[in-house]
Amino acid sequence: MGPEEKTIMTERSAAVFIQAWWRGMLVRRTLLHAALRAWIIQCWWRQVLEKLLAKRRRMVLEFYVQQEWAAVRLQSWVRMWCVRQRYCRLLNAVRIIQVYWRWHSCHSRVFIEGHYELKENQLNIQLEISLGLQACKVQQCIPLPLKE
């Protein structure tokens, strides 16, 4: 092998080396572009998944709030019903006590006071009747038929 052949071989190996380097650069550039595009797609997909997850969380939270509000409303209605029942029972008891008290006070506190005068042919009556807090005054002149 002569010096010319050596230079041809070195030129050829240099050309092969440059071609390999260039092909490697092209492949690396293509891989870099593919990796960047894949990274962009992955970022977009993560955002989509995060939005879906946030939407699901929001729906679950709204459902929970709705359930809680319904439970609170139902509890308040039940409490109101219990209080109303108790109030009605107490009101009926008060009415019964009032009826008996009024009956008792009317029947136990009757006070009758009266005067009468008999003059010639008429009878003068003055009566005062007290029923508890109420008073009634009666004054009447009654003519008497006398047989002569």
UniProtKB/Swiss-Prot annotation:
InterPro entries: IQ_motif_EF-hand-BS, IQCF. Keywords: Repeat. This is IQ domain-containing protein F5. It comes from Homo sapiens (Human). Residues 11-40, 67-96 form the IQ domain. The gene is IQCF5. Gene3D superfamilies: 1.20.5.190. One of its GO terms (molecular function) is calmodulin binding. Pfam families: IQ. SMART domains: IQ. PANTHER family: IQ DOMAIN-CONTAINING PROTEIN F5, IQ MOTIF CONTAINING F.
